[in-house]
Amino acid sequence: MAADLGQIPDVDIDSDGVFKYVLIRVHLAEPSGDPAKECKEIVRGYKWAEYHADIYDKVSGELQRNGYDCECLGGGRISHQSQDRKIHVYGYSMGYGRAQHSVSTEKIKAKYPDYEVTWADDGY
């Protein structure tokens, strides 16, 4: 059976660079196949990903093996400058559309409280 949703980190992003990210909604898998009411959104962004789907496929596969269901809410890009303590969220995913960057930014701010975290809908 799946563990508590609270054990899944809200944010996991690479420490430096510009890279793609996705916003994913995670919920417990119900035996009936219907999504559970309890859910949370998580942010995942990595330099190794050529496509947004690469991130979603890897993360959702891991979560599904642990008893969760996932849906991708959209994507974009993250510019992470750890030396300057700045993170900027922007752009969109050709495959998944634009993530709600305001939601992603709030999650990132909680993990990086001493950073300047901004977002914009411009760019690709």
Curated annotation (Swiss-Prot):
Cellular component terms per the entry's GO annotation: cytosol; leading edge of lamellipodium; nuclear body; plasma membrane
Keywords from the named record: Cytoplasm, Hydrolase, Protein phosphatase
Binding site residues for substrate: K20, S93, M94, G95
Keyword Cytoplasm: yes
E.C. number(s) listed in UniProt: 3.9.1.3
Family: Belongs to the janus family.
UniProt-recorded name of the protein: 14 kDa phosphohistidine phosphatase
Originating organism: Mus musculus (Mouse)
Designated gene of the protein: Phpt1
